[in-house]
Amino acid sequence: MVAGLEPTTSGRILIGGKDMTGARPRSRDVAMVFQSYALYPNMTVAQNMAFALENAKVDRATITERVGWAAKMLQLTDLLERKPAALSGGQRQRVAMGRAIVRKPTVFCMDEPLSNLDAKLRVSMRGEIAALQRDLGVTTVYVTHDQVEAMTMGHRVAVMKEGVLQQVATPTELYNHPVNTFVAGFIGSPAISLFDCPVTEEGVHLGSLLLPLPHQVAAQVGKHVCIGVRPEGWDLVGEGEGLRMQTDLVEVLGSQNYLHAKPTSELRTGSRVAVMIDRHTRPASGEPVWIRPNEQVLFFDPEDGTAL
């Protein structure tokens, strides 16, 4: 809809403060970068990058200047005479981006541009795109199913579920203050652990533990509340001081480890719980551990999943 390729059923699309809802695609000054590179196999890198400008009847001197400028920015200068078949996946994606950059558009729309790359290349290209957007200063709408890409690249992130907008906020706001359990579960890796807990005047009952009753949960006394605990929201404690768990595996990530443990029946959940632990801690598989939530606990309505 932003590019004008799909009809807008309601609302307005403003680009640079101008209402472009009914404008033709070529009038919107939006450049697209697709999941598939969509490069012309019979053209060189330079010809692919220049194609849109040639169609727009831009003069040759300007085309040469812009292609050279974009190629230098994307480290493609030495590859301008090659054809797509002679390029790596990362190089092809750079060419696709260069084709959009030379237009000097008002808005970039990038539709999962890194999904066809291997894991290592995705990480490096993620940084390159973020740096490129910073240097160009062009508004960029970036579509992705990868929450790591969204969190590391976005200044503001819009989370959607089945076409319905759930929350628009900064990555930090999404992580710390999700509006519902869907957003809480989508943002963060390993995923947040969710538990259905009864609430009494004494507090919130998480298995054998009694957690303090926060003000936003006071109305739930006599009912249940859904609590969410992220991996860093757990503390390892001494025997008998927390929930008894059975170590399933330890995920080693260098500077830190993630303990994945099976909960006991008192938690009424079959899913594993992920706990962030320091790199020197590595309990063996099957070894019992005791964990307790710290102050980083989120509370949700158990009926509709909205944050309390």
Task: Describe every region a protein language model picked out.
Residues A3:
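Helix-to-loop junction immediately C-terminal to a conserved catalytic motif
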Residues G11-D19:
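Conserved ABC transporter NBD signature motif
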Residues G22-F182:
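ABC ATPase nucleotide-binding domains
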Residues P190-L194, V199-L308:
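Non-catalytic connector elements of ABC transporters
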